């Protein structure tokens, strides 16, 4: 992935569309909206940090994983909308209005409401072989227009529970 590809992916996840303008401005806006501070380092280091915080679950739950856990706990569904819309919808559902602040602070406040802690209680686990996970397509597929490399969005059709835990 190029720097612009990674940055655009994070922007689409957070805002719903890739932003335009100089990379430096786009990086600064994401950092400000996400944590409220600008980080030090090279452009690529900063983009990788934003990308990893959004998608990587290897050291801690990613923003997407946290949002999925919050939404499922609060409304028993997980939306395919952008993060900005998902946070807003949950705040209106919980508080009756939207809050101000960074994505991080808003997610922490929702987590305190849902779980009694700013930290969402998630643990990594291994899904046993042959575990059935039913999925439903989000987008209508047309075999005539479908080609290798196309993104096909899907969602869980049913909850997958293992040892009393919901698996994401």
Feature map (PLM): residue ranges:
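Alpha-helical, heptad-rich or low-complexity scaffold/stalk segments
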Residues: 1-115
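Short beta-strands and strand-coil junctions in structured, solvent-facing domains, enriched
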Residues: 16, 37, 77, 97, ...
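Extracytoplasmic
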Residues: 25, 122, 128-132, 147-151
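Buried hydrophobic packing residues in well-ordered domains
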Residues: 30, 90, 127-130, 137, ...
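Short boundary/loop segments of OB/S1/cold-shock single-stranded nucleic-acid-binding domains
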Residues: 116-123
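Structural recognition of beta-strand segments within beta-rich domains
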Residues: 134-135, 143-168
């Amino acid at each position: 992935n190029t720097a612009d590809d990674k940055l655009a992916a994070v922007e689409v996840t957070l805002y719903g569309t890739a932003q335009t303008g100089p990379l430096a401005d786009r990086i600064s806006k994401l950092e400000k909206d996400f944590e409220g501070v600008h980080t030090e380092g090279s452009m690529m280091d900063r983009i990788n940090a934003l990308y990893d915080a959004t998608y990587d679950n290897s050291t801690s739950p990613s923003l997407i994983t946290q949002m999925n856990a919050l939404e499922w706990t609060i409304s028993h569904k997980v939306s395919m909308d952008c993060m900005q819309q998902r946070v807003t919808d949950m705040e209106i559902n919980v508080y009756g209005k939207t809050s101000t602040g960074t994505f991080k602070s808003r997610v922490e406040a929702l987590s305190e409401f849902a779980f009694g802690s700013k930290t969402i209680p998630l643990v990594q686990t291994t899904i046993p072989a042959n575990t059935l996970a039913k999925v439903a397509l989000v987008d209508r597929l047309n075999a005539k227009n479908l080609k290798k490399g196309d993104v096909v969005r899907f969602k869980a059709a049913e909850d997958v529970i293992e040892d009393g835990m919901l698996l994401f």
